[in-house]
Amino acid sequence: MNVKRCFFLIILVVLFSNSIYAQEYGKQYEKCSERLKNVNDDSIYILRLLEKDSCLIGVTAPNFKASTINGHTIELHKLKGQVVFLNFWGTGCGPCVEEIPGFNKLVSHYAGKKVKFIAIGSDKVPDLKKFLKTIPFNFLQIAESEKIYEEVFKLSEGIPYAIIIDKFGKIYKMCLGSAGDLSFSFYENLIDNCLSGKQ
């Protein structure tokens, strides 16, 4: 088999795999969203939203490819073998900013271990870089990423929003809202359980 044909087949396999993962997530998302239909009461609707998210646990996470603000490329499915912590946030979100000290502590705590921390923000690159000069946030930073939030993961509940993905690429936990000062201990427990394979 010549090199060009081999390369072409590899590309086809990658594209096919990405499509399968997206379809699996999309199909389960539609199934989980059924419980939101015909719910008028706001408090019950929020409860159903949270139930919808928990319904997605165990599904293969959809792939995305994006660049960090420092120009490094991240492709989610290439991170298999590691626990991946995704944090959807924004610099203008007070509860998001409150979690940063705890999140920085998590990065230090898991240094050298198979855990990857990625912050996915809605801010433009210059605005995010300016913010980070004042308040360091030690996750890998992806900016202007509404597409990942809305189209890839199909989220709509708001931020902060965290997703923990296990070493097999499956969604382990989805968490809406801020843990504030407790962000380190709250997520340390979840990450430790994920690393050890506990449900």
Regions found by a protein language model. Name each.
Residues 2-63:
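N-terminal targeting signals for export/organelle localization
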Residues 63-84, 110:
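A short beta-strand-turn-helix
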Residues 79-82, 112, 137-138, 157:
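Active-site acidic short loop of glycosyltransferases
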Residues 82-84, 88-92, 124, 158:
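Short pre-active-site segment immediately N-terminal to redox-active cysteine/selenocysteine motifs
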Residues 88-105:
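Conserved redox-active cysteine motifs that mediate thiol-disulfide chemistry
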Residues 118, 132-168:
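Short, internal strand/loop/helix patches
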Residues 127-129:
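Acidic helix N-cap motif at the loop->helix transition within catalytic regions
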Residues 161-199:
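Thiol-/selenol-based redox modules, centered on thioredoxin-like
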